[in-house]
């Protein structure tokens, strides 16, 4: 049987890894796919690719690959929202299947892209867009297809996890660790997407759509970064038996879908709380399987290439199948996607960690307890430290039971108005992940 011909657009870290894996494991991949896979053309701008290329035609124009009549599958690895969107739509228009590792593209333009792919009867595969080398999309879309998914939670950005691990283990401040992450290549020169939760929100949007059968709605995801976290809060959380992780949470409720990325206290004895460094993990709770955990490298040349090539093998296997019988892009049949609303963060329910800096005066705790009680907020535990020598302020740390966020917001306004409370109240959400 003739080999399937693919074109790779983008030969950076992931593109170079993909080319290397395809060359190194060509025989094994052909045995799995049922046909050989040949790289027929590469589009790249760099003069210093991350692999050795001999004999493969090269172009600087990605659209040349999308229009090449010899190519069956286009692998999009250029990143970004704009040119990548145009490239993928052009490839689909020309009847080519697409494999991509572009989470931003899928989260923002996925609904449009999938509709066009259905119209043209082609496949768009995107396992590598979420959690690098962890096949979590396949696990949710296929392995857990018997389940009604209740919730999922994930550490899905390695940069943020590296920073929080260093802050906890070595007592280092956020700016110091961020600088090291940039020097090591874990964070970009502009780290906004990583440290403000945007990258994780792209990935969470994709996972939530597959888990709950809803359209992609990245614009409704709540994002909160880790730039304001201090070593003090990391240490207080540890003393209370928790660890702070930058967590993406998607939960099905009677009112709608929670879709949120933010710093989160997790009990230290949970497996996911012990995922450290640049590693990723996603926990999924289904009504039949219960809780399952998927762990591995969330980025990197070959881990991500593993998912790209895995998708490529799946596409080759499915190329001759009836399009109506293929696994749907978002796990559910397109006409069965639900219109569940995405809840605003104020309507989401969580337990909370609150840190209050108070003057060392009698009666402050009673005032704090009264404000919380008036708003139906129950206190689970309180930790009060000695007054700090420099300013004489007493750090007061509280853990609450679960409550709607709007109630906490109202309580914080009242707490910050107290004469004996100084500065802003620190608020971090708590998830038990039972």
Predicted regions, residues:
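N-terminal glycine-/serine-/threonine-rich beta1-alpha1-beta2 phosphate-ribose binding loop
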Residues: 1-94
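A short hydrophobic/small-residue beta-strand
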Residues: 97-99, 379
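Rossmann-like NAD(P)H-binding beta-loop-alpha module
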Residues: 118-199, 206
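Substrate-binding/catalytic subdomain of NAD(P)-dependent oxidoreductase enzymes
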Residues: 176-274, 279-281, 300
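A conserved regulatory-domain signal marking ACT and ACT-like small-molecule sensing domains
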Residues: 307, 312, 316-434
């Amino acid at each position: 049987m003739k080999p399937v011909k693919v074109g790779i657009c983008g030969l950076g870290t992931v593109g170079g890894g993909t080319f290397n894996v395809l060359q190194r494991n060509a025989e094994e991949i052909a045995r799995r796919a049922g046909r050989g896979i040949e790289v027929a053309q590469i589009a790249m701008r760099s003069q210093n690719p991350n692999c050795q290329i001999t004999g493969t035609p090269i172009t600087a124009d990605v659209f040349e690959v999308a229009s090449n009549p010899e190519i069956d599958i286009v692998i999009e690895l250029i990143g970004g929202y704009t040119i990548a969107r145009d490239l993928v739509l052009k490839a689909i228009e020309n009847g080519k299947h697409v494999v991509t590792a572009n989470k931003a593209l899928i989260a923002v333009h996925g609904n449009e892209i999938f509709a066009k792919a259905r119209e043209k009867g082609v496949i768009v595969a995107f396992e590598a867009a979420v959690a690098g080398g962890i096949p979590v999309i396949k696990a949710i879309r296929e392995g857990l297809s018997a389940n009604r998914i209740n919730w999922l939670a994930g550490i899905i950005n390695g940069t943020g996890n590296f920073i929080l691990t260093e802050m906890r283990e070595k007592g280092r401040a956020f700016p110091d660790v961020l600088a090291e992450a940039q020097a090591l290549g874990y964070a970009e020169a502009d780290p906004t997407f990583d440290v403000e939760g945007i990258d994780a929100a792209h990935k969470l949007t994709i996972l939530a759509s597959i888990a709950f059968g809803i359209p992609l709605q990245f614009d409704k995801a709540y994002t909160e970064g880790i730039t304001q976290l201090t070593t003090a809060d990391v240490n207080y959380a540890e003393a209370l038996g928790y660890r702070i992780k930058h967590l993406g949470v998607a939960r099905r409720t009677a009112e709608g879908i929670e879709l949120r990325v933010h710093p989160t206290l997790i009990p230290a004895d949970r497996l996911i709380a012990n995922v450290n460094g640049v590693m990723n993990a996603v926990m999924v709770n289904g009504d039949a399987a219960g809780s399952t955990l998927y762990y591995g490298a969330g980025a990197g040349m070959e881990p991500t290439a593993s998912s790209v090539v895995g998708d490529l093998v799946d596409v080759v296997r499915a190329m001759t199948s009836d399009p109506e019988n293929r696994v749907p892009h978002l796990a559910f049949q397109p006409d069965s996607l639900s219109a569940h609303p995405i809840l605003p963060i104020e309507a989401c329910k969580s337990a909370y960690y609150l840190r209050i800096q108070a003057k060392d005066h009698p009666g402050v705790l009673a005032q704090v307890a009264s404000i919380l009680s008036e708003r139906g907020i129950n206190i689970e535990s309180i930790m009060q430290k000695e007054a700090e020598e420099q300013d004489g302020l007493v750090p007061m740390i509280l853990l609450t039971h679960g409550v709607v966020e709007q109630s906490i917001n109202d309580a914080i306004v009242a707490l910050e108005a107290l004469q004996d409370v100084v500065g802003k109240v620190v608020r971090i959400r708590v998830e038990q992940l039972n």
